[in-house]
Amino acid sequence: LADEVYERLYYLDDTSSGAAPSFLDLAAPDDRLVVVQSFSKAFLMTGWRLGWLVMPASMTPQVGKLIEFNTSCAPVFVQRAAQVALAEVDAITPRVVAHLRQCRATLVPLLRQLPGVSTSSAPGGMYAFLRVDGHADSLALARRLVQEAGLGLAPGIAFGPEAEGWLRWCFASRDAGRLAEGVRRLGDWLAAGRPM
């Protein structure tokens, strides 16, 4: 099972398609590979809960039953929006990627300027992960940042034990200035020397 919902939100120029490398590029025709795709990310249809699967034809009957008994079908207006999105993919995706690339280029350098904060420049997606020295409990830190700095970040532990100690910052903002304001709030909070 390969979750490739962020495939189109890729910022490196090392593929001919501009998309992230796919497991489909490596799979043999008889592999039991199922690739999950979504309209939520690259088409900004978050919350509409519409996507698609790429899978061997032999799996279609069983997966069809699973879908029928769990979700039934997507509303017609959502399906029509998806048709337009697919028809306009060459116009939509580059604009979305350019905007997210700009937001990432705003957020990541500002975070790197904060003492005690480490982050990396994500090659894709719409999130930056950061670590704050001296704050190993990501849930406790996320709660404190909401209460004390007015800054809502996701705790790394929500994404599995490997992400404990990290925070996830969504940089999919309409206004990159809001990202700068968020970093200012984090910087002010850190400068106040708030102990854990």
PLM regions and their residue ranges:
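PLP-dependent class I/II
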Residues: 1-196
